[in-house]
Curated annotation (Swiss-Prot):
Residues engaged in binding DNA: 90, 109, 150
PANTHER family for the chain: FORMAMIDOPYRIMIDINE-DNA GLYCOSYLASE
Record keywords: DNA damage, DNA repair, DNA-binding, Glycosidase, Hydrolase, Lyase, Metal-binding, Multifunctional enzyme, Zinc, Zinc-finger
Chain's role: Involved in base excision repair of DNA damaged by oxidation or by mutagenic agents. Acts as a DNA glycosylase that recognizes and removes damaged bases. Has a preference for oxidized purines, such as 7,8-dihydro-8-oxoguanine (8-oxoG). Has AP (apurinic/apyrimidinic) lyase activity and introduces nicks in the DNA strand. Cleaves the DNA backbone by beta-delta elimination to generate a single-strand break at the site of the removed base with both 3'- and 5'-phosphates.
Quaternary structure annotation from Swiss-Prot or TrEMBL: Monomer.
Zinc finger (FPG-type): 235-269
Family matches, as PROSITE patterns: FPG_CAT (PS51068), ZF_FPG_1 (PS01242), ZF_FPG_2 (PS51066)
Substrates-to-products reaction catalysed: Hydrolysis of DNA containing ring-opened 7-methylguanine residues, releasing 2,6-diamino-4-hydroxy-5-(N-methyl)formamidopyrimidine; 2'-deoxyribonucleotide-(2'-deoxyribose 5'-phosphate)-2'-deoxyribonucleotide-DNA = a 3'-end 2'-deoxyribonucleotide-(2,3-dehydro-2,3-deoxyribose 5'-phosphate)-DNA + a 5'-end 5'-phospho-2'-deoxyribonucleoside-DNA + H(+)
Gene expressing this chain: mutM
Protein known as: Formamidopyrimidine-DNA glycosylase
One of the protein's GO biological processes: base-excision repair
Amino acid sequence: MPELPEVETSRRGIEPYLVGQTILYAVVRNARLRWPVSDEILTLSDQPVLSVQRRAKYLLLELPKGWIIIHLGMSGSLRVLSEETAAEKHDHVDLVVSNGKILRYTDPRRFGAWLWAKDLETSNVLAHLGPEPLSDEFTAQYLFDKSRNKRTLIKPWLMDNKVVVGVGNIYASESLFAAGILPDRAAGSLTDAESVLLVATIKAVLLHSIEQGGTTLRDFLQSDGKPGYFAQELQVYGRAGEPCRQCGHPIEIAKHGQRSTFFCRHCQFRPIWPIMLW
């Protein structure tokens, strides 16, 4: 599933082609996504795009009448194409804008969403979200206080959007590895010092992934059709049985909250970051 770096990469990729342009029309080839494509998407002709923002894993297109809210789901991606590009099987939604470009949404598994909101404050999908991990609001003190008395395992706890947004399976595993914290510890066991280190590693891992265009494991593509290159630098995620890049011991895999967790039991008792290959 695209996580914060992939969504932010998409935002940065599409923003120059949309902001200041006017929507000519939309094409919905298949409205049956995770939630049905909002009817309003087809009524936005002559609406200028004022901004392209991101909240958590949602892309937000600001128009005078309201907001288009896009979620990439498990396998979605957005590309900016020229007008003559023919649609393929999994190309479900197009926005055609006044510079002749098409914002095309492709989603083989159809688990994403195209929703409409008159204002973000009343949007159910954006309610109750935690802080952005790259914001000043996400601090070591916040994480330490939030973790007190929590018996939940730390890895699924970090993936809870009420705690912090956008840190999914890939980046939770990678950040815990960089911080030298085993994923099967209770969240409440975090110390002050570990909270400082974990916040720093989460920010560093996310920022570096954004610089690399995110992680492509299967379906995700950047807006220009290129894959994300952070997959080549993953330290533990998806590497079960392979030698750890730091110590040579095999990477282990476990199930935490129905999700696969990757870690190095030999390394994750001491900080690895900033002594990372990248």
